[in-house]
C-alpha cells in the first residue's frame, strides 16, 4: 500500500514499497506526476541500484556484509571501495583508477593515509583516543593535548625541521565552555550569561562583540567593536521577522505556510519576493525599487532539482551612475548537466560556455567565445597545466596538496602556507603581495594587501566588521544573509540572486550604487561599483588582488573552477579539489569543507539565529549508555557507524544517537530487550546544536511533506530518506521525536566528534 504525504499547498509525495517493506520508488505529483527515485535490490535485499529523477541509473556493487564496494554511473564511470575486516574503508579508487589507502590502529582509528603517489601522513592518539600528533606529507607536525573531556587545550604546529612554530591554547569553565583561546598572538575571551548564552567576546582585553538574548535563547542584539548594533525580532513561531537599529536599519521578513521566505522588505523601499515550486525550489524571484524592476526571473529545474533555466531581466547601469538604462536588459540563461550532475553548458543570451570532465571529475576542457582551454592533471587530481588561446599556465604543489607556484606568460605567482597549512602569502606575477593571518577559530582576522592592513571580526563565522581598508570602518548587518553594511554615516543594502550572490547594492534612498554579474563558477563578468565591497559570489569575500574567494578553510579560484588546496574532509567526493562537484548552479561551499544546497531547503529551526541554526550557546542534554568494557568514547563512535542500520541511518549515512535524558534512553533500549543497566555506563553531554534538521517540529515535517506517524512507526523507509536528505545536504544531524517514549526527543549526529 503506497504511503501518500501531502503538504499545505497540496503537493503530494507517494512512496511505494516492495512486499518486504523495502522502498520501491518515490513519486511527486503536482501539475503532473513524476518519479523522483527508484530503488533496486538483490536477492539478499541489499540495495544495488537507484534510478534518479532524470532516469539515469546508478549501480552499486555490495559485498556479503552489504557494504558498497563500487558505484557505477550511466556514463561508464566507476568508483571503488575496499574495507578492513572490521569494516573500515581501507582503499578508495576514483574514476581514473587512482587509489588512496587508509590504515588503522587497534582501536579502529586511522593511523596512516597514503595518497595516490605513495606519500604518507601519520596520526597518533593519546590513551583516551584523542588525536595527539599529526604529521603531514611535508613533515609538518601538529602536536595536541586534550583535557579529560577530550577538548583541545594546547596545539603546537611546526614545519619539518621543528621551526616556524604556531601555538594555540584553549581554556574552559566547569561546564566545558571555552573561556579563552589564543593563536598567533590573537587572544579571545568568551563571557556567558546566567543561561549559558554567549554574552561577550573580547580580544586582548578589548570588547569585540556583545550579545543580548531573550528568555528563549534567541539573539535580540549584536553589537560590533564600533558600537554599531543589529537588533532582532521574532514571530510567534520563532522565525526572524525583523532586523533593525536606531540608525535607520530596517529589514522585514515574511514567510509562507511552509516557513520559506516569501518576501524581504528593506528600509529604503526595495522589496524582494519569492515563489516556490512543489519541490521547494525557487520558481520566481523579483526585486523592485518602487516602479523600477531590478531583478525579475523565472526558473525551471530537471528531475534531480538541477536548475535548467533562468529567464527574465536584470537592470543594467549606465556607467557608474545610479540611473537604470533603458533598452534590453533581458538575461536568458540555460544549463545542461551530465549524468553525474556536473555542469556541461551555460548558455547566456545565446552564447555558450561548454565544459568537459574526466572520469575523476576534473575539468579537462572549456570552450567559450575566446576559444578552447585545455587542462592536464596528475594522479592526485591536481591541475598541472592550463592552456588557453591567450596563455599557458603551469602549476606546482607541495606534498600536502597546496599550490605553491603558478607560471604564466606574465611571470610567476607564489603561494606560501604556515605550519597549519593555512595560506599565508600570495605574491603575484606583477609583484603584488597579499598576506593572511588566522585566529584560534580558524578564521582570517587580518589581511595585508601590499602592506595595507585590514582586520576582520566575525559572528558565527560570518563577517561582522572590518577596519583598515577604508578611512572609516565597515559594519555588517546579518539576517537571512548579509543584509546591509554601514560605513561612516552611510547605510547600504545588499540584494541577492537565487545563489545568494550580491547582484546590487543600494543606498538608503533605494538608489543603485553597485551592480554585479557572474558566470556559473563565480568569474566576475560585469562589475560596476561606487562603493568598495568584498561580499560577492554566493555572499562570500572576494580578494581582488589574488582573484580568489576566501571560503574559510580554503581559497577558491573561479577561473579554474576549483580549490587551490586539497580538502581535509574526505567525505565530499573522491576529488578533493573540485568545487561543489562541478555543479555550482545548485550548490555552494562557504566552509571550504563540504558543498551544500544553495539556498538550503528545509533548514528550519524553532529558534534561528543568523546562520539558520540554534543560537550560540544553546545546548542539548544528550544521554547514551554503553557497555562498561567499551573501548571507545561515545562521541568518537559516529565516524565508525558508516554501515549501521538504524531509524535514521543506514549504509553510507553514519550517525550517533542520543536521547533527552535517562528515562528516554532506557525506553529506547527497552525496545531491544535491554533492561539490565548494571553493566552499562551512562554518559551525559551538553551537545551544541548547529545546522540541525528538526523533524520534531511540526512545521518542518509539513515543509518536508511527512507525518509524525511515518517517522515513529515500524518502517524505516521514510526515516532513512530523511537521513539521506539531511546527510547529503550538509546538515550536522537530525532532531527527532522518540518512537518509544511520548514527549521524548532524540538527536542523531552524523559526526559527534568535538560537539561538547
What are these model-derived regions, one by one?
Residues 1-7, 11-52, 56-73, 77-94, ...:
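Beta-strand elements of repeat-based all-beta scaffolds
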Residues 116, 137, 545-548, 559, ...:
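Structural motif
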Residues 373-379, 384-385, 471, 488-552, ...:
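A motif-centric feature for acidic-aromatic and gly/ser/thr-rich catalytic loops and repeats
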Residues 505, 523-525, 554-562, 574-603:
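Short, low-complexity export/processing leader segments characterized by acidic and small residues
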Residues 569-573:
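Short linker/helix segments within small regulatory modules
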Residues 600-651, 671-756:
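Active-site and NAD+-binding cores of ADP-ribose-processing enzymes
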Residues 650-659:
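A short, exposed loop/beta-hairpin motif centered on an aromatic-Gly-Thr core
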Residues 660-672:
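A short, charged, amphipathic alpha-helix used as a generic interaction element across diverse proteins
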Amino acid at each position: 500500500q503506497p504511503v501518500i504525504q501531502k503538504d499545505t499547498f497540496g503537493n503530494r509525495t507517494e512512496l511505494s514499497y516492495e512486499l518486504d517493506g523495502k522502498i520501491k520508488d518515490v513519486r511527486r505529483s503536482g501539475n503532473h506526476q513524476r518519479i523522483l527515485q527508484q530503488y533496486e535490490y538483490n536477492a539478499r535485499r541489499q540495495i544495488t541500484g537507484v534510478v534518479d529523477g532524470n532516469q539515469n541509473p546508478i549501480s552499486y556493487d555490495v559485498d556479503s556484509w552489504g557494504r558498497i564496494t563500487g558505484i557505477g554511473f550511466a556514463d561508464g564511470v566507476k568508483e571503488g571501495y575496499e574495507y578492513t575486516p572490521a569494516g573500515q574503508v581501507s582503499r578508495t579508487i576514483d574514476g581514473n583508477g587512482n587509489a588512496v589507502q587508509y590504515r588503522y590502529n587497534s582501536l579502529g582509528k586511522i593511523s596512516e593515509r597514503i595518497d595516490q603517489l605513495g606519500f604518507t601522513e601519520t596520526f597518533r592518539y593519546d590513551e583516551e583516543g584523542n588525536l595527539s600528533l599529526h604529521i603531514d606529507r611535508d613533515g609538518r607536525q601538529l602536536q595536541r593535548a586534550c583535557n579529560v573531556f577530550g577538548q583541545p587545550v594546547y596545539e603546537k604546529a611546526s614545519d619539518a625541521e621543528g621551526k616556524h612554530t604556531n601555538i594555540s591554547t584553549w581554556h574552559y569553565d566547569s561546564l566545558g565552555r571555552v573561556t579563552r583561546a589564543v593563536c598567533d598572538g590573537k587572544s579571545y575571551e568568551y563571557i556567558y550569561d546566567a543561561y549559558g548564552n554567549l554574552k561577550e567576546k573580547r580580544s586582548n582585553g578589548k570588547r569585540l562583540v556583545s550579545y543580548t538574548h531573550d528568555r528563549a535563547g534567541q539573539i535580540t542584539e549584536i553589537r560590533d567593536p564600533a558600537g554599531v548594533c543589529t537588533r532582532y525580532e521574532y514571530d510567534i513561531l520563532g522565525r526572524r521577522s525583523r532586523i533593525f537599529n536606531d540608525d535607520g536599519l530596517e529589514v522585514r521578513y515574511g514567510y509562507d505556510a511552509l516557513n520559506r521566505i516569501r518576501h524581504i522588505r528593506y528600509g529604503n523601499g526595495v522589496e524582494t519576493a519569492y515563489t516556490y515550486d512543489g519541490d521547494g525550489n525557487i520558481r520566481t524571484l523579483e526585486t523592485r525599487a518602487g516602479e523600477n524592476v531590478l531583478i525579475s526571473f523565472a526558473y525551471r529545474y530537471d528531475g534531480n532539482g538541477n536548475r535548467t533555466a533562468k529567464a527574465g531581466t536584470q537592470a543594467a547601469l549606465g556607467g557608474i551612475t545610479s540611473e537604470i538604462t533603458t533598452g534590453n536588459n533581458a538575461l536568458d540563461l540555460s544549463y545542461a548537466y551530465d549524468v553525474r550532475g556536473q555542469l556541461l553548458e551555460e548558455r547566456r543570451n545565446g552564447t555558450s560556455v561548454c565544459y568537459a570532465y574526466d572520469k575523476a571529475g576534473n575539468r579537462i576542457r572549456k570552450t567559450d567565445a575566446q576559444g578552447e582551454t585545455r587542462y592536464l592533471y596528475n594522479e592526485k587530481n591536481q591541475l598541472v597545466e592550463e592552456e588557453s588561446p591567450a596563455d599557458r599556465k603551469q602549476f606546482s604543489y607541495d606534498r600536502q596538496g597546496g599550490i605553491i607556484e603558478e607560471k604564466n606568460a606574465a611571470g610567476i605567482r607564489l603561494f606560501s602556507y604556515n605550519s597549519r597549512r593555512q595560506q599565508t602569502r600570495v605574491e603575484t606575477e606583477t609583484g603584488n603581495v597579499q598576506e593572511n593571518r588566522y585566529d584560534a577559530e580558524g578564521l582570517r582576522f587580518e589581511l595585508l594587501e601590499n602592506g595595507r592592513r585590514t582586520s576582520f571580526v566575525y559572528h558565527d563565522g560570518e563577517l561582522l566588521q572590518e577596519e583598515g581598508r577604508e578611512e572609516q570602518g565597515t559594519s555588517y548587518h546579518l539576517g537571512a544573509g548579509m543584509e546591509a553594511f554601514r560605513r561612516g554615516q552611510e547605510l547600504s543594502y545588499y540584494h541577492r540572486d537565487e545563489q545568494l550572490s550580491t547582484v546590487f547594492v543600494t543606498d538608503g534612498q533605494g538608489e543603485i550604487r553597485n551592480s554585479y554579474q557572474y558566470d556559473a563558477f563565480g568569474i566576475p563578468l560585469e562589475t560596476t561599483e561606487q562603493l568598495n565591497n568584498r561580499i560577492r559570489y554566493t555572499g562570500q569575500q572576494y580578494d581582488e588582488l589574488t582573484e580568489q574567494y576566501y571560503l574559510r578553510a580554503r581559497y577558491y579560484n573561479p577561473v579554474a573552477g576549483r580549490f587551490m588546496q586539497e580538502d581535509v574532509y574526505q567525505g565530499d567526493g573522491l576529488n578533493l579539489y573540485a568545487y561543489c562537484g562541478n555543479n555550482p548552479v545548485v550548490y555552494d561551499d562557504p566552509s571550504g569543507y563540504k558543498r551544500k544546497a544553495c539556498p538550503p531547503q528545509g533548514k528550519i529551526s524553532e529558534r534561528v539565529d543568523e546562520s539558520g541554526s540554534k543560537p550560540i550557546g544553546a545546548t542539548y542534554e544528550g544521554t547514551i549508555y554503553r557497555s562498561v568494557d567499551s573501548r571507545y568514547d561515545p562521541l568518537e563512535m559516529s565516524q565508525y557507524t558508516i554501515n549501521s542500520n538504524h531509524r535514521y541511518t543506514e549504509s553510507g549515512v553514519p550517525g550517533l544517537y542520543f536521547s533527552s535524558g535517562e528515562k528516554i534512553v532506557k525506553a529506547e533500549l527497552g525496545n531491544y530487550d535491554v533492561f539490565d543497566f548494571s553493566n552499562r555506563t551512562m554518559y551525559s553531554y551538553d551537545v551544541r546544536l548547529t545546522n540541525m534538521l528538526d523533524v520534531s517540529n511540526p512545521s518542518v515535517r509539513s515543509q518536508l511533506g511527512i507525518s509524525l506517524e511515518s517517522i515513529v512507526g515500524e518502517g524505516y523507509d521514510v526515516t532513512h530518506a530523511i537521513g539521506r536528505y539531511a546527510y547529503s545536504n550538509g546538515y550536522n544531524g537530525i532532531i527527532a521525536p522518540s518512537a518509544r517514549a511520548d514527549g521524548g526527543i532524540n538527536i542523531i549526529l552524523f559526526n559527534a566528534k568535538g560537539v561538547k
